[in-house]
Amino acid sequence: MLSTSSDSHYQLKIASFNLFNFIAPPDAFYEFDNIYTQEQWQKKLNWIAKYLNEHQPDVIAFQEVFSPDELETLTKACGLDYFSVLDSPQVMDDFIYSKPVVALASRYPIKEAVSVSADKEWAAQMGLVSEFEFSRKPLRATVDLPKLGLCDCYVVHFKSKRALFDAQDIKANSATSSFRKSPAGTELNTGQLLAMEALGRWGSSVQRGSEAALLRYAMVERRSQTQNPMILMGDFNDILSDGVLAALTSVDTRIKPQADMSQGAMGDIAHQLGFYRLQDSYDLYQASQYSLSEQARPATHYYFAKGSVLDYILLSSEFDAKNDLSLAEVGRYETYDRHLINPSFEHDSQSTDHAPVMITLAIRE
C-alpha cells in the first residue's frame, strides 16, 4: 500500500511472480495425472497469500495462470481489489490444460486492459509469417496510480528456451525436412539429432527475440499516443543482457533525431531517445542513493545448480532519477528466493520454481 517514508517520498511496490502451474483441482496441467490434491492446492494458495500479505505489493504481475477466477479471489482477499486477465488457457483434452496465461492485480483502479498483438506488417518485414503471434499474449493494464496518474503496466511471459521441436516431432510430421529422406527404418544418426536440436533451440530464440522486439514496438506506439509512464514485468525466460532480448533496452541507433526547441525538453535529442527507453529496475536501484553496496544479483530461477535471472521489471524514464522529467526512483529491489536456496518441505513444497521480484518506488512530491 502507499506509504510515506521519512524523507517525504511516497512509496509504491511493484512485483512480478511466476506462480508455477496455478491450476485448481480437479483440472490438470499438461498431463492427465498432473492434478493437485486438495491439500496440495490449499498449501499452494496459502504460500501465495503469505507472500502477498507479508510483502504487500501494490501492483503485481502473474505468470503461469491456469485458474484465473481462483487467483482473482485470492488476490482480492489479500487487499488487491482490482484484477485483470484477458486470455484463456488452452484446453487440450476435457480437463487437461496447456498454455497458461498472464494476469495483473492492483490495489488501485485498472482503467483499461487489452491484450497486446504483434503488428502483422512489421512481423512480415522481419521475415516472420504475417500470422506471427506471441506464444503467450502480453497484457497491458492502465492503472491509475497515486501521485503518478495513469501508468501502462505490461505483463509478459516470453517463449521458453525449450526447443520448438525435436526428433519425435519431425518423425510425426509427414510434411517436414530432408532429415527424413533416408531409407525406411533407418534411424537418424547422432549428427542429425544434434543438428535438429540446435534448430529447435534456435527456433525458440527467434520466437522469444521476435516477441521482445514486437512488444517494444507496440509499447513505443502506445507511448507516442498517451505519454503514459511504462512498467514491463514478467518472466523473460532469458537473460536480459543476452542478444536475443537486446531489443527491449537497446538505445544503440543510427537515427539522429531532429532537435525541435519548440518542444522544450522533448526537443533535445537525448530526451527524445530517453523518453522511449526502458531500463532494468535493478540497474536503476544500483545507481540510486538507496543502494547499500555492489552485490551479485540474486538468481530468480535455478536449473539444477545453475542460477539465472529470468524475471524482470523494466521502467521508463519517469523512474530514472537522472532524468530531468523523473517522477520517482527505485528505492529498493528485492528477490524472494528463500524457497529456492534453503527450502523447507513443510512450508515450500507447493511454492514456485521462480523467485518473485519486487521493487519499491520512491515517488516525489
What role is predicted for each listed range?
Residues 1-4, 115, 124-127, 131-134, ...:
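Metal-dependent phosphoester-hydrolase catalytic domains
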Residues 182-189, 196, 204, 208-232:
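His/acidic metal-ligating clusters that form di-metal
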Residues 80-92, 174-182, 256-257:
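Acidic, His- and aromatic-enriched active-site or binding-groove loops in soluble protein domains
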Residues 34-38, 57-62, 198-206, 232, ...:
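Second-shell loop/turn segments in exported
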Residues 5-14, 134-193:
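Beta-strand-turn-beta hairpins that frame and shape the catalytic cleft
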Residues 1-82, 87-102, 187-191, 212, ...:
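N-terminal, active-site-proximal structural segment of metallo-dependent hydrolase catalytic domains
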Residues 20-42, 162-204:
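Acidic/histidine-rich helix-loop elements
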Residues 65-166:
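Structured beta-strand-rich core segments of catalytic domains in phosphoester-bond hydrolases
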